[in-house]
Amino acid sequence: MSSLEQEKHHLFKPSADFANKSHLKSLSEYQTLYNESIKDPDKFWSQIANTFYWQKKPNTISQYNLDIQKGPVSIKWFEGGKTNITYNALDRHLEKSGSKVAFHWEPNASVAGISLTYKELHKKVCQAANALKTLGVKKGDCVHIYMPMIPELPIAVLACARIGAVHSVVFGGLSAESLSDRMIDSKCKALITADGCYRGNKIIPIKEIADQALASCEAKGF
């Protein structure tokens, strides 16, 4: 067997402590859950929904039609329910786990990474959300995020969700014209970007590309 083939078959066994904290302890346990989700989807997803905080509980779990012979394809989830996904992701963890790490970020270059606790992340998300509101972004508006893989990316995503805005993460390798087209098609209300980033050893002028995209939008009457 070649070294490449050996590498493909190399397994990394987690520690017992790490494995015991897993939500699923075995493949058979996963298969059992999967079968339950297929057999009775509403019951399964109702149990999942009960693990979330709801300001108002949903009236139904799901309503859908995937048969075009019976009408237009449609899917609705948790009709009548009201919650905020960032409350579930951040706020409800602050009291007991605020000092725990929410995520680690490892940079492209060989410099120190960053670890943000739930408390730190919550503060930054609220700041970003309020900044968007100050700019006039409101519930239902589309916000494009044209950024490299930096900590501010998930912060921007969560900030949009916190105020009910729809975020669209745009691939950082797109041209200014492609970015412009997507902004126009989605009737984008705001664009969040960064000064630049590394791609390998090359510096990519993200902000310059974003500025060109905005100029293109304006030239097209958007």
Please provide the spans of the model-predicted regions.
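Adenylate-forming
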Residues: 37, 90-94, 121, 125, ...
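Structural core segment of the AMP-binding/adenylate-forming
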Residues: 162-222
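Glycine-rich phosphate/diphosphate-binding loops that line cofactor/substrate pockets in enzymes
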Residues: 94-96, 132-137, 181-189
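Short, charged, surface-exposed hinge/linker loops at domain edges
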Residues: 12, 18-20, 50-81
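Acyl-group handling in specialized metabolite and lipid biosynthesis
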Residues: 23-25, 30-33, 72-82, 106-116
